[in-house]
Each structure stands twice: as structure tokens, then as C-alpha cells.
Amino acid sequence: MSTLRLKEAKVPSVQFVGDDDVLSHILDREGGTKLKKEKVQLLVNPQKVIKKAECELEKSDLEVLEDQNYVEVLGRNIQESLGNGSAVDGRNKVYSFQHRKHPEEMTKLALELAKTSGKIDPLASNDPKITKNIARKSKGHSSEKAPLENNNKNEFPSIQPHNVRKRLIASRSHCDSESEYSASSSEDDEEVAKDDEEDTNVVRCSKKSQGQNRLLPAPVSKEILPKKRKRDKAGDLVEEYFEAHSSSKVLTSDRTLQKLRRARVDQKTLRNLLSKFVPSFSTEIGQLNQQHERLFDKWILQLRLGFNIVLYGLGSKRDLLEKFRTTMLQDSIHVVINGFFPGISVKSILNSITEDVLSHMGTFQSVLDQRDWIMNRFKEDSSLELFLLIHNLDSQMLRGDNSQQILGQLSSLRNVYLIASIDHLNAPLMWDHAKQSLYNWLWYETTTYSPYTEETSYENSLLVKQSGSLPLSSLIHVLRSLTPNARGIFRLLMKYQLDNQDCPSYIGLSFQDFYQQCREAFLVNSDLTLRAQLTEFRDHKLIRTKKGTDGVEYLLIPVDSGTLADFLEKEEEEES
């Protein structure tokens, strides 16, 4: 029996001890003394964490993991105490701490937990103050503590909660400015008092950081605000663009140069004023003209050989051709044709040849008959020679196909010599291969840099009082681009105005009477067609409409009677 009792006494008894029993045992054995708080204990109260875990254990698994991590940290403290050489005397000294704590340890703990969990805060890693605190070592610790702590980091990984990391980051920037705690060898009561002061400082810093975090906006919102402003600004620009282009009306100013209140001078006065102006490069222009004048003998020879000469280049060539006429054609029969004149036509050119050169006073049925008679006369009499000098062969009055065809046929005669000038850039487009063979051109570049004084004397100018010559050229140019019915409508109105030109009370032709005349001539079939045609005339400023005292609309051509008579005569000549 004694041996059995001894064996039973030697058998150890096993009893389960929970975490609550361990903590209560620790508190009872310490006798109410305040435990030294390690790195995690600065932010986490063990009793509160355990009570919270007991109450909310069934709510979520994440809080259970936090309790387990806390226990792991407690186990870690055991190994730290062993590494520091602290005595563990049974269960009494398991959780006792023999080394001092410094303010930097809270930051170190946060960085260690962030590294072990694999989630490093980018703000903490980029802060130069944090790197400075990490590199600093406390005076009271031995040099062997660093490798042990590194090993413990790998041994006990823990997950740092988001709210704890946020508080650590916020408190770091405010607590660094506080005075550092200097280590010294003192008694236990002084260490406890200093630990209490550190706890109060940490709590104050955490409260300040929490209050400032509530007041200050997050840094992400500061980055978002400029983007929102840019988007709003871009949206405003888009809306302003569409608002500016939404209206279909185009606002243009009606203040033209014609409304300038300046007295207009006549052509002679303007010419006298321009003649007093001497250009600064007049010497060079004179030398250039002398080079062109040396070609006069060559031109005469080439004309005699059956070629015709065309001059092109920048500047007026009228003075150059006039010098050629006065020096080389004194003893020859020649005709000078001013193509820039608004009233010039092929009919007038042929009349000058038949009347002044051939001394024929008869009439011809058409322009073609007159052309044939002139050609036959020069072919029959080989002794007849004629020099034609045409200024601006590409003018609006001579650039027509019929005009160029007749002039080309005349220049193809052996005893008719043609020398002409062109100024338009696209003047060669007037001639096809057939006309080119008739003219048989020799091209000479004769740049003179002279002003186009005579050529532009008949053009519209705001400084010169104009006669009816310019409206005639404009009238012919516009009507040539219209349909035959449109020309017939305008001819009816023009004839009616010429018939009533001697009536002083004539204010125009009423619209109803004009519509009746157009219907009788089978030109229109409705008043809408006539109004559309009149709108085109009005756009070209060929007609003017006004209402009389009786409210009737009257039509009037704003051109003098002499110009209208010349235009009507030319139209009849071309039709015949």
C-alpha cells in the first residue's frame, strides 16, 4: 500500500488554466502594484480587451484574432525578458519587466508590426523624422537587444488594426516635438512616476491628434479638389462655346469705308497728287527699264518673222509699250487698244481697223462678216502692214471666247503683227491649243514695278468720283453669268427705263406692270419666279426697289441713261 501511495503521489495532476485565471493570479500575486507596460500596453488595456473579447466573441471572428495576437505579444514579452537577463521565478515573475521604456518604443512597435504584417504605411516610410527615430538607440539598453528583437519580429507576426495605425501616425508628428526622456539610474518609485507622466503625454498626444484629424480634411480630398475645379472649368468652357455658336445670326458691322465723311476728289487731282510721289528705288527701276528697252530691235525682228509677243510680269507695262511705239513704230501703221477701258469691245476694234486703216465707211451685218472682210483685204494686198498694240489683253471686256477667237485669227495673218501685255495670274488659261497656234506667242518677262495708274483709273475708288464707265463693266460682267431668261428680264426693264428717261416724274416701273410684260414675253410663269430673279439683281446692286406714296413697289436701275444705251447696243451687236 505504501508503494502504491508513493506512486500515486509521484503522478502529476493536470488541470486546465484559462487566460482569465492567469491574469487574476498575476494581479493577486503582485498585490495591486501597477504593472509595467510594454510597447503594446501603452495603447491596449488587457482587462478591457479581454472583457470585450468575452462579450463580443460571438459577433465577429476578427476580434478573436485581435485577442490571440495580444496573447502572442505577451508571450513575446517573456522571451524579451529572458533575453534581457531578468529572473523568472516560477509563475510570480513570468510577466515582470526589468528594463526601462522610452518614448521611441511606441514608434518602433508600430513599424515592427507594419513590417511583419506586410503592410507598410507609405506616409510613415517617407517621413524623415521617423527614420531618425528608428536609427536612434536608447542609452539604457544593451547592444545585444537589437538582434533579439529582430528575431522576435520574425517569430511573432501580428496584424496591426487600422485605427491603431492611424493613431500612431497622427501622434508621431505631434509627439516628436516633446522633450526626449533622458535615461538615468534611479529607484523604482521614480521610474513609476515617470512612466505615469509618459502615459499622460501619450494620451494627450493621441487626443490632440484625434481632434486635429477630425477638424482637418484628409489629404486625398485636397488632391481631388483641383481635379473637380478643372472639370468644372472645362465644362464651363464647353457650355460657353456652344452658347456662342448657337445663334444662327452672324453679326457683322455695317460701318464700311463708304461712310467716311471725306470729300472725294476727281481723277485729275488724284493723278497730280500721285505724280509728286517719288519712290526711293526709282534709280533701280530706271535701270530695269533700260534693260527691257534693249530688246526693242529683237522684238521687231521676231514680229517680222511671223511671231507675236506677249509681255508679262509685275508692274504696269503701259509705259514700256508706249516707249516701243514711239521709238520703233513711227513710220508704220499701228493701232493702240486700251483693254482696261470699260467700254472696249471687239466690235470697236474692228471698226477702228475698217474705218481708220482701211478707210471703209460701209456697214456689216455682223461681227463675223466684218472680220472676214478685213482678213480678205489683208490677204489680197500684201503691201498692207498693221501693228496691233493691246494693253491688258486679259481684261474683263476682252477675255471672252469670241473676242479671243477673233483677235487670234487677225494675228495669224502674215502682215498683221500683235504685241500685247497681260497682268492676271491665270491669263494663259484663256487659250486652248487652237488659240495658242493662232497667236504663236513668244513670252517675255518684263517686270517694271511701276504702279497701275492708268489701268486702275476706271475702277471703283473711295477717293475718286466715278462716272458711268465702271457700272458698265460691272453690268456686263454680271449679266454674262446669268441665264438667258434673266438677261431678257433685265433687258425689258432697261428698255422701259430708256423710253421714259425724258420724263421728270418717272420713279420706276411698278411690279405688277413689269410682271405683266414678262408674262407676255414668256420669261416667267408666276410672280414668285420674278421675285426670285429680282432678288438676285438686288444682291448684285443692279436694281433698286422703293415704294411710292400709293404703296406700290417700283423698280429702278441705278445707272445713268448713257451707260444703259451703250450696254444695250453691245448686247444687240453680240446677238447679231
Swiss-Prot record:
It is found in: Nucleus. Residues 186-200 have a biased composition (Acidic residues). GO terms for cellular component: centrosome; chromatin; chromosome, telomeric region; heterochromatin; inner kinetochore; nuclear origin of replication recognition complex; nucleoplasm; nucleus. It comes from the Eukaryota. The modification Phosphothreonine is found at T116. Pfam families: RecA-like_ORC2, WHD_ORC2. Involved in LRWD1-binding repeats lie at residues 1-100. GO terms for molecular function: DNA replication origin binding. Residues 119-218 are annotated as: Disordered. The modification Phosphoserine is found at S246. The keyword Ion transport does not apply. GO terms for biological process: DNA replication initiation. Transmembrane segments: none annotated. Residues 149-161 have a biased composition (Polar residues). Keywords: DNA replication, Nucleus, Phosphoprotein. Belongs to the ORC2 family. Component of ORC, a complex composed of at least 6 subunits: ORC1, ORC2, ORC3, ORC4, ORC5 and ORC6. ORC is regulated in a cell-cycle dependent manner. It is sequentially assembled at the exit from anaphase of mitosis and disassembled as cells enter S phase. Interacts with DBF4. Interacts with MCM10. Interacts with LRWD1 throughout the cell cycle; this interaction, which occurs only with non-ubiquitinated form of LRWD1, prevents LRWD1 ubiquitination and hence stabilizes the protein. Interacts with POLQ. Component of the origin recognition complex (ORC) that binds origins of replication. DNA-binding is ATP-dependent. The specific DNA sequences that define origins of replication have not been identified yet. ORC is required to assemble the pre-replication complex necessary to initiate DNA replication. Binds histone H3 and H4 trimethylation marks H3K9me3, H3K20me3 and H4K27me3. Stabilizes LRWD1, by protecting it from ubiquitin-mediated proteasomal degradation. Also stabilizes ORC3. This is Origin recognition complex subunit 2. It comes from Rattus norvegicus (Rat).
